[in-house]
Amino acid sequence: MEPAFGEVNQLGGVFVNGRPLPNAIRLRIVELAQLGIRPCDISRQLRVSHGCVSKILARYNETGSILPGAIGGSKPRVTTPTVVKHIRTYKQRDPGIFAWEIRDRLLADGVCDKYNVPSVSSISRILRNKIGNLAQQGHYDSYKQHQPAPQPALPYNHIYSYPSPITAAAAKVPTPPGVPAIPGSVAMPRTWPSSHSVTDILGIRSITDQVSDSSPYHSPKVEEWSSLGRNNFPAAAPHAVNGLEKGALEQETKYSQAPNGLPAVGSFVSASSMAPYPTPAQVSPYMTYSAAPSGYVAGHGWQHAGSTPLSPHNCDIPASLAFKGMQAAREGSHSVTASAL
């Protein structure tokens, strides 16, 4: 009896994909083959595919059975709980044991015989999937027991906190107003309310505080400097300039000028005591000027009224002689009239 559902093959027969051919059709194929009918004729007569007929007849000739499936059944299961237990025991005693050594030991101890002993690949799979997880769990438990208690996680907020063993220094530094307090075990001592400065981020402030606390000399803290104002400094004396005595400044500002070849001036000369500069004589551009060497005046216009070119200071020669010498030099010069030119 053909099933009421399925697919139709190329010969018009109905079959169900994935299911074996019914036993009645299998038996009929074998009977027709024994009668001497060719497989191609059996396929057309029973409307079964040629491949299915050939396969059923080949299996019947080899095994004498028309039943589908594996002949003799599947291999019995060898990885029993007893075998797994012995494998775990071997692995715990010798963690570096190999799979083939476990297989030989199973045979030597009589746990398995040569027919049901697991293969090397099966033992490796058992070590990896079943025993490996248990061993890792045991190692993790033992490691967890030897580990110290974990430290609390670092809080993350707008105030950067760092793990620091300096708890004593943290107790000394007060918390600025308006800033939430941070636990001393995980926070560094903070003295500045700013949380975005380079020293706070790098932790330099706590190091400087530690050095200042450990040093024998007193170093002012930031709080002490912030409490100081300009009113705390003493006022300068009226006779002092920028906190310094005027006498000391006057002594420093008075200095002696280095000698430069000219005699030093001991006193200042008022403008009223100086004579005006002499007016030069007007000389025609068409006249030749010649004078004796004694007529030149080796002096300066800024010389004193009572001085001469020969002796600029403290000279006894009257000033009128210098002008007389210049007048004589002008008279002794050879002049040419404009009419001669």
UniProtKB/Swiss-Prot annotation:
Pfam families: PAX. It comes from the Eukaryota. One of its GO terms (molecular function) is RNA polymerase II cis-regulatory region sequence-specific DNA binding. Residues 7-63 are annotated as: PAI subdomain. Residues 168-189 are annotated as: Interaction with KDM5B. PROSITE patterns: PAIRED_1, PAIRED_2. It is found in: Nucleus. Residues 82-130 are annotated as: RED subdomain. Keywords: Developmental protein, DNA-binding, Nucleus, Paired box, Transcription, Transcription regulation. Residues 4-130 bind DNA. GO terms for cellular component: nucleus. Interacts with KDM5B. Transcription factor required for normal development of thymus, parathyroid glands, ultimobranchial bodies, teeth, skeletal elements of skull and larynx as well as distal limbs. This is Paired box protein Pax-9. The lineage of its organism: Eukaryota, Metazoa, Chordata, Craniata, Vertebrata.
